[in-house]
Swiss-Prot record:
The lineage of its organism: Bacteria, Bacillati, Cyanobacteriota, Cyanophyceae, Synechococcales. It catalyses: 7-aminomethyl-7-carbaguanine + 2 NADP(+) = 7-cyano-7-deazaguanine + 2 NADPH + 3 H(+). Keywords: Cytoplasm, NADP, Oxidoreductase, Queuosine biosynthesis. Catalyzes the NADPH-dependent reduction of 7-cyano-7-deazaguanine (preQ0) to 7-aminomethyl-7-deazaguanine (preQ1). It comes from the Bacteria. GO terms for molecular function: preQ1 synthase activity. GO terms for cellular component: cytoplasm. This is NADPH-dependent 7-cyano-7-deazaguanine reductase. SUPFAM superfamilies: Tetrahydrobiopterin biosynthesis enzymes-like (SSF55620). Belongs to the GTP cyclohydrolase I family. QueF type 1 subfamily. Its main location: cytoplasm.
Amino acid sequence: MSTPNLYDSTNKPLYGERLIEESKIICFDNPNKKRIYEISIELPEFTCKCPFSGYPDFAKLNIFYQPNSKVYELKSLKLYINHFRDLKISHEEVVNRIMDDLLNAAAPHWIHLNADFNPRGNVSMKLDIYSGQKRN
């Protein structure tokens, strides 16, 4: 009895890798533009790599926002976030890049991006970025 080959022997990217590589943030129309409401999204498995050591960095990202005319589509957001997993980038740069991309994709009234990086070498880091004015 032979064991099935779980890896693509042609070295082509697997379908999940292709989806991540091609990812972009997709939005859809806000279903209730007249109502002021807040959406929170938790992404607990964010990863990127330290630009100095190459070691992986892990974080939980939290996005809180008040939509304007567009709302983030969650699967596209998940794939977009996953494309950072092999990128060598500082915490500060990656969080600012994500915030820029979120703003460009949906232009929410207000947004708060929180990144809580796991400790490495007995040091942890949290970043918070805000944009816009919260509406009541």
